[in-house]
Regions:
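Gly/Ala-rich beta-loop-alpha elbow adjacent to hydrolase catalytic centers
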Residues: 78, 82, 87
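RNA-binding accessory domains that recognize and position tRNA/RNA substrates
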Residues: 1-50, 54-60, 64-72, 88-317, ...
Length: 510
């Protein structure tokens, strides 16, 4: 399989670069700038991309790399900081720019015959985000593009196949960004494009069968996208050798537990174990209102219930997880041995032993996981499931959690989802849900005064969840949702809409 290395120097778009490469049907993997040269030599990469980063190359505490990487005969593309770093490594001069460039900037291609600018307009819009720039080109390199404030916006050494661009081709704001990356991958690196989800499924199923043999596999199934797709792949590979353990703590959306069970027992050949334990969790949460304490209790009790069920399985065999690629990436922003902790990485108790851990999705980004899920025939509702907090509705009920509050919130949330679906508006939203703030308000229903629950609606639009804006849902849809909730959901007499962006707020209320 063809591979491109994305060498991480701490930029915010590093995962996006890898995803854009994969969008071109070429596999990309990310390594931190601390990866030894020997590892890169052994990687059999078709090309290397130096990422951006927040540092200045002339600060000796900034991330650097040995010059030998440019002598491996592998094509290299430097982006932003990576562009400056390559120039610095081979004798160029980098300076703090007289005028920084941020946002959309007009780029002029000065060498039309450049391989990476093939079929790119002479003038186009690119996305810039830099305070430093290359001032003097190193020997053997030539300028291929410029902007008004950046005379060296792109350069190349065609003979050595080393390229640099000061802008960010990976972001959608760069008009020909996808084409520029495509040109580097196909025109310069000589890739053919063998990274496709159909072949991934076939290859993964084959390797799973070889590894598992006739042993058993246990997977913790949450009903989320990652564990669901992992279950689908494992089921296709080993069928009844797979046992999925689904802990229903009673804090899921309305009828979601039944939907998950029905989906996997009807579509896939596997053993499905459902543990219904709502009462257990409600008892453990009795009298607790602090959000962090609730999270801790839910996590601790889930861990206990899940592993108690695992211990009941006669044969352990292998343990499978829905770990995906972003869970595994080492970040160039910190120490190389520091890996992000994530809920998809499960800690095992000391008294439970397995042959090995299997992570069939560990090479995929989330969008690729969804693509695999669709090809496996997993329902759209699961494949495109919105982000849902690990503690479930436990962090959407402000204050103490009771069975009655769960029912109110589940019913209100179901109405919201139903109306968004009926109006075809759900595709416009990154996330939407109801919150029970724990506030009662005075109302009038018929001839009677009421003092019942207030329900808040939260809906946001975002590309990355780092920032988010409140969604501008049409008033007529909001009015219909409010009317239905107050009429159909018992013990609710008022509905409000949260119009707070992130920052200063967060998407979830707790």
């Amino acid at each position: 399989m063809e591979k491109i290395l994305v060498l991480d120097f701490g930029g915010q778009y590093n995962q996006l670069i890898a995803r854009r490469v994969r969008d071109n049907n070429v596999y990309a993997e990310i390594l931190p700038y601390t990866a030894p040269l020997s590892e890169i030599k052994e990687g059999n990469y078709k090309g290397i991309i130096f990422t951006g980063g927040p540092n200045s190359v002339f600060d000796m505490s900034s991330p650097h790399y040995t010059k030998e990487i440019l002598e491996l005969g592998i094509p290299v593309l430097g982006i932003c900081y990576g562009c400056q770093l390559i120039s610095w490594m081979v004798g160029g001069n980098v300076e703090t720019a007289e005028q920084s460039e941020y946002g959309k900037i007009d780029l002029t291609v000065t060498k039309k015959q450049s391989e990476i600018f093939a079929d790119v307009d002479e003038t186009s819009v690119v996305w810039m985000s830099h305070t430093d720039r290359v001032k003097v080109m190193p020997s053997g390199f030539e300028i291929t593009a410029k902007t008004e404030a950046c005379p060296i916006a792109a350069y190349e050494n065609e003979e050595k196949k080393i390229y640099g661009v000061q802008f960010h081709p990976e972001v959608t704001h760069t008009q020909f960004g996808f084409k520029i990356l495509h040109n580097f991958l196909y025109n310069v690196c000589g890739c053919h494009g063998d990274w496709k989800m159909d072949s991934f499924i076939d290859d993964t199923v084959k390797s799973l069968r070889e590894k598992i043999g006739d042993k058993k596999v246990i997977l913790g199934l949450s009903g989320g996208v990652d564990s669901s797709v992992a279950a689908g792949l494992l089921s296709r590979a080993v069928g009844k050798q797979l046992t999925c353990v689904f802990v229903d703590q009673g804090l899921m959306r309305k009828d979601e537990g039944n939907f998950v069970e029905k989906t996997f027992t009807s579509l896939f050949d596997m053993n499905f174990v459902r543990v219904n334990c709502q009462d257990h969790f409600i008892n453990a949460l009795k009298g607790v209102s602090d959000p962090e304490q609730k999270r801790k209790i839910i996590g601790t009790e889930f861990y206990k219930v899940f592993w108690d069920e695992i211990r009941k399985q006669a044969e352990k065999g292998f343990f499978a997880q829905g770990t995906i690629y972003p869970d595994c990436i080492e970040s160039g922003k910190g120490d190389a041995d520091k890996i992000k902790t994530h809920h998809n990485k499960v800690k095992m108790p000391d008294d439970v032993e397995f042959i090995d851990v299997i992570e069939p999705l560990s090479s995929l980004f989330k969008d690729e996981v969804r693509a695999v899920g669709e090809k496996l025939g997993i329902p759209h509702e699961l494949v495109w499931r919105q982000p849902f907090p690990g503690p479930g509705l436990g962090v959407r009920i402000i204050g103490e959690i009771t069975k009655e509050k769960i029912e109110v919130l589940q019913n209100a949330d179901w109405v919201l989802r139903d109306e968004m679906a009926k109006n075809g508006y759900e595709k416009n939203l990154a996330q939407f849900f109801c919150v029970l703030p724990g506030v009662n308000t005075v109302g009038v229903m018929g001839d009677h005064r009421t003092y019942d629950n207030l329900v808040a609606i939260r809906a946001v639009t975002t590309d990355d969840f780092m920032t988010a804006d409140w969604a501008k849902i049409p008033y007529d849809i909001l009015a219909k949702v409010s009317n239905r909730i107050t009429n159909e959901v018992k013990h609710v007499n008022r509905v409000v809409y949260d119009i707070t962006s992130k920052p200063p707020g967060t998407v979830e209320w707790e």
